[in-house]
């Protein structure tokens, strides 16, 4: 039997804060990695490409690895503040999420380990690197209810794909099933 890992968004905002605080007390780089993911909605492969010099402006310009599409986006104010604090004493050519071994970025596998451990410590399960992106999408949807905007951000081809990706479809299905009574 094949085991399928289902990766979920973090639906509870208090848990998002708890995980960030946990990471902040352990390692500033790792806390920023978490914040970057939940506030940008970028894939981990794109997040890990950032260098310190990419964070000096009021937003970012990136060509997404998976889609090869260009994106120009303003920083979220909370992320911008965290970035300013973190990069103040860093070399502009350094990777933002620098590995301890050399001037390379941490790997996707290391990012996964960081996120998984922090979430498990805070009793949040079914997580992976996509959890950050899905968390961004989930909470953005709850605020805006704008599926078209999220489709554009995520480069999805249909509303159904986006809603399923951010965990809204399953949540609605579960609520409906619980209400069923004969």
Predicted regions mapped to residue ranges:
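Conserved catalytic core of the tyrosine transesterase superfamily
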Residues: 1-182
């Amino acid at each position: 039997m094949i085991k399928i890992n289902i990766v979920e968004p973090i639906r509870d905002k208090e848990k998002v804060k708890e995980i960030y605080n946990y990471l902040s007390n352990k390692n500033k780089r790792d806390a920023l990695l978490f914040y970057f993911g939940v506030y940008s909605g970028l894939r981990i492969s794109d997040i890990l490409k950032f260098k310190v010099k990419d964070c000096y402006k009021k937003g970012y310009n990136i060509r997404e690895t998976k889609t090869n599409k260009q994106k120009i986006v303003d920083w979220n104010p909370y992320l911008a503040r965290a970035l300013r604090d973190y990069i103040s004493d860093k070399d502009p050519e350094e990777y933002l999420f620098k590995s301890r071994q050399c001037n390379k970025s941490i790997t996707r596998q290391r990012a996964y380990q960081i996120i998984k451990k922090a979430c498990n410590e805070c009793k949040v399960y079914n997580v992976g690197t996509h959890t950050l992106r899905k968390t961004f999408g989930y909470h953005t949807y709850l605020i805006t209810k704008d599926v078209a905007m999220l489709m554009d951000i995520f480069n999805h081809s249909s509303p159904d794909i986006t809603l399923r990706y951010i965990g809204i479809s399953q949540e609605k299905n579960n609520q409906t099933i619980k209400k069923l009574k004969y």
